[in-house]
Amino acid sequence: HRADLIALLAEGAQDAGVDLRLGQEVTQITREGAAFNLHLADGSTLCPDFVIGADGVRSVLRPALNGAEQGFFTGQVAWRATVPNPGQGAEARVWMGAGRHMVTYPLREGKLLNIVAVQERRAWAKEGWSHPDDPANLRAAFADFTGLARGALKAVDSVHLWGLFRHEVAPVWAKDRAALLGDAAHPTLPFLAQGANLALEDAWVLAHCLRTMEPSDAFRAYAQIRRPRAAKVIAAANGNAWKFHLRNPLMQSLAHTALRFGNAIAPQKILGQFDWVYDHDVTAS
């Protein structure tokens, strides 16, 4: 569960002596020579020696390094919800339909089921994960899904909706005394489930560089190491989107038959096309 991961990271940071200040919002970043000053919503200003912006797709630091950038709406929206596991077991599953697909996978030792449901539509939706929606809208969009999928959707009593936007990988990840990390540097669509993983890889490489170099040199080395892989993964995720939403009945039948046949005789070959993503060991590179 993402909340469990965040709690572990927070605990590790505190054990390492990090001073965590919760409930703070950086509203603006200004430069003073090579330094960056952080202006907070409460009116105070922080003047740190160095800044690492791991502040997500709405990063305040990214435009300070790169200028303003607007993502574009892909014509797809996603719902996310968590429900008690209705009996799916420990498997991750994907259900596909015309212009839609739904992914479910277990959390917390199989007690919970995470649901991510994606639909193609023209109606625009805001970017971000915190926009509540009526569960009835989710169920209506996937009304013809059956079996375990329908059971999971029936159990949803709270759901969030967000628009899927495509962003360019930031041209500049590091400058002077500042660096970007995670979605702040490279927002990704969810079609390879690599957003959080890329951020963790970033963090490991940046920490390794900081252990062996001066911060400004470490920032530059980190960006040089990480940018090519992040760009490659994001391009693969972008290219994976259409495969879930085939509308032509013939193409859909052929593709799904090929998947079933391939999975029956050589499951590892199908999965192997993304070995370079999932088998990557950032600690060894």
Tell where the protein language model's regions lie, with residue ranges:
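Conserved N-terminal helical subregion
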Residues: 1-82, 122-139, 279-285
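Short, flexible helix/strand-to-coil boundary loops that buttress conserved ligand/catalytic motifs
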Residues: 33, 65, 153, 192, ...
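Histidine-centered metal-chelating micro-motifs
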Residues: 58-59, 78-80, 100-103, 185-186
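Conserved mid-domain beta->alpha element of the FAD-binding
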Residues: 52-53, 104, 137-138, 158-246
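Alpha-helical membrane-targeting segments
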Residues: 232-235, 239-277, 285
